[in-house]
Amino acid sequence: DYLHLTGREQTHIDFIESYCKMIGIFRTDDDQDPKFSKSLELDLNTITPAISGPLNPEERVTLEEAEERAIEFQEAHISNRSKTAEIKSSKFEYNGQETTLTDGNIVIAAITSCTNTSNPSVLIGAGLLAKKAIEKGLMTQPHIKTSFAPGSLVVTKYMKNLGLDQYLDMLGFHTVGYGCTTCIGNSGPLPIEIDQVIRDDDLYVTSILSGNRNFAGRVHQLTRGNFLASPMLVVAYALAGRTDINITNHVFGIDQDEKEIHLKDIWPSQKEILDAINSGLNPEMY
């Protein structure tokens, strides 16, 4: 199915099938269960969503625990700060408006080409989440530099075909290129005003990206905490504006019915994602 979907020629598909059968790795539902030297039992109820950070890729932390982890590193920086040992809020003018930047704020949010962009489900999921957020009146914070760098032109084709690109654009996740960008430090400079206030007040600011490396200084020299997440969570955290929160119960805003907007209210269902994949992708795109 994957080879058909991605536009491979039938002769190539037949060759792959014949080769896999010849070396014994082509399986059907009618085959006998293979015998394994070892087996592993896993309780699926123990699987929980997670992000990684703030300093290394192996620092996995569940969404519920992420707030405590982020605050721990944030407070360590604040306690060593010479100017003040309290959480700092800095006001400055940006794009003609008074803006506030505080310790813990996100200043870079990027859906990157690393790892995730070969998987349509998470990118379409990010687009659907953006659509739901816009429909509820949510916007990303003005102090965040947002970007979208797919790993393939095909991504742009199916996002446009589904009409989801416009919602990512509205949240600032414009397509900036194809290939390595923010994940290897190629985010470019932060706006001068934001760069200056971070330096002047020694603020603890962070980044969130869908890459696979988050070592100190790799994403940007001024982001002291860097978190790795799925494209959907990158959009969600950008809407929240900070990493020192429990994103699962964070209140993003108030809707038209004066009800609190939570992550579950903008998170697309698996059916919505699968329906979009089935209607939005075709072999001709490849």
For each predicted feature, which ranges?
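Non-catalytic terminal/interface segments that mediate subunit docking, oligomerization
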Residues: 40-163
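Self-splicing inteins and homing endonuclease
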Residues: 36, 40-46, 207, 211-214
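A generic secondary-structure signal marking the coil-to-beta-strand transition
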Residues: 38-40, 104-107, 172, 204-206
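Mobile "lid/hinge" segments at catalytic clefts and subdomain interfaces of large enzymes
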Residues: 1-19, 23-27, 122-124, 130-142, ...
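Noncatalytic alpha-helical scaffolds and linker/capping helices
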Residues: 24-26, 32, 114
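Hydrophobic, well-ordered secondary-structure elements that form the walls
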Residues: 115, 168, 235
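Glycine-rich and small/hydrophobic secondary-structure elements
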Residues: 166-173
